[in-house]
């Protein structure tokens, strides 16, 4: 199987055509995702960067879905290299324009993507529905999928919670100073090895996030492309340093043209957990967002990640719809 979609592969299912997507289709895919969830606009430049920075060792196939030669959505499947996976999990994703979200067309999309994924070696399909998308959840449950786990998403009102956040930040700054931990943005760090250190620490943190599909280590050459994303800047990416070690990071994603501000990634080294480092980092990111005039920020975490969920509650976050993961046995 190719790691990206073979341009010669065109699929047809149930009156729909699936043509291989190119980077130039990323903006359309972002538009479709925005139409599906208007409260969560997706940024076209961000999607193009996402598509352009795929790990070359993974299998990634993306298609534009057409009905009567008219684009109505996109669909994809991907998976890590099988020699790095104990079980052959593969993810299936899609978005259709709201008027095109019918049971029949959804069945055609999943038939096509499941067939491609299975041919690539996937034996457990993973699909996702937002917590308030009852139609999609019902469809998945009726077609052999079962609910596996849920994430929790949160919104923080920076206007209503500003005083509380400022007080918490002052307390955390004092605590970090007393502990000898420096909190600063990446651009101010002069260590020539800082990006490699952030990579190693992030890999350690990602490995410990509760999940069903195991985290697969990312090569530094792939990881470092994150810093070129249009949603992040080095002067808005906060790190924690203890001596020579970088022991934590927290980053907000700022879409350049449209979309909400979300936590992109927060992680800490095992050796500093329980010492308030994640709290200090997250508080600096939202303090900076306040200074930039942002009024709300959002975050999402696995529903079993108790420490970070507790921190979200302390900071004043309120729940919004998260995502539900569904799995389907494809060994038959």
Predicted regions and their residues:
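Acyl-donor-binding surface of acyltransferase catalytic domains
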Residues: 1-11, 98-190, 324-328
